[in-house]
Regions:
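Short, flexible N-terminal segments of the mature chain
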Residues: 77-85, 254-259
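Pre-Walker A adenine-sensing motif
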Residues: 3-23, 44-47
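A generic structural signal for short, non-catalytic loop/turn and secondary-structure boundary residues
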Residues: 24, 137-139, 226-229
Length: 259
């Protein structure tokens, strides 16, 4: 029998997401690192830079929504600003002499245009308010972010790593600790891992979980070389081979293992 792909039901809208070619077409991502290492900045780059993440409805759950970056993002998206308009605020922050949230209010009050189409919901409750993936509209390009939700029950978060792709939802879990994440659901089903500095023991465990196609010493040397530059991070794209971008410095500087 010749196996035909026609018998895999694609569904309307599910093939229209166009993330960057440097990212998986459907993302189950982890961003891991200690406090103040740059995790939120990396997430904002993915959210706001042109042609990286393709999404129409953003859901953010977390205990860190008081951070200035999230306040600006929330105000911008809820006010109808586009990615480019919100990016412009971040890129020109040194020239601002006013609170950026207030700036958005003044801009709109004075007749400024808001040409964004992304809808967004922000919640400080990481457990009861997280919808089941089946509750999402699969015809929309959904993006879910779980930030610092490790102390809450993980059942709903786990569902996005096992069933989220069936409901047209990309997911990022931002956490200070990789090994406290559920192994058989979140860790083993992740396909994009962004790592900020880790100690030698943690590097060894991550290598054992995902990176046995590279020598452990070479992997440690690669990670430590990347992390010598402050705020740099290692990207591991588990949908790519080691000779086609699995290992990277930041998002787009490929590393080709010698082993």
């Amino acid at each position: 029998m010749q196996v035909s792909k026609s018998y895999a039901w694609r569904g309307a809208g599910k093939e229209t997401r166009k993330n960057s070619p440097l990212l998986p077409s459907n993302i189950r991502g982890l961003i891991i690192g200690k406090s103040n290492c740059g995790k939120t900045t990396a997430m904002m780059n993915l959210l706001l830079q042109k042609d990286w993440l393709d999404y129409e409805l953003l859901h953010v759950f977390g205990k860190s929504l008081h951070q200035r970056e999230y306040k600006i993002l929330r105000k911008g998206l809820e006010s109808g600003l586009s990615k480019a308009q919100i990016s412009n605020i971040f890129e020109n922050q040194d020239a601002l002499n006013i609170d950026p949230v207030k700036l958005i209010e003044i801009y709109l009050d004075q007749g400024g245009t808001a040409d964004g189409k992304i809808k967004a919901n922000f919640y400080s409750d990481c457990s009861s308010q997280v919808p089941d993936p089946t509750e999402l509209n699969e015809l929309q390009k959904n993006l879910l972010i779980l930030d610092d939700c490790l102390l809450e029950k993980q059942a709903k978060a786990e569902a996005y790593y096992t069933r989220g792709r069936h409901n047209n939802c990309d997911t990022f879990y931002i956490s200070q600790n990789y090994f406290r994440l559920p192994r058989q659901t979140i860790r083993e089903n992740s396909n994009l891992i962004i790592l900020f500095p880790q100690d030698s023991k943690n590097i060894a465990h991550i290598h054992a979980d995902h990176c046995t196609d590279i020598d452990i010493k070479e992997f440690k040397d690669f990670c430590n070389a990347v992390w010598r530059v402050r705020y740099n991070f290692v990207t591991i794209d588990l949908t790519s081979s080691k000779l086609n971008g699995k290992y990277r410095e930041n998002f787009d500087n490929f590393y080709f293992p010698n082993t």
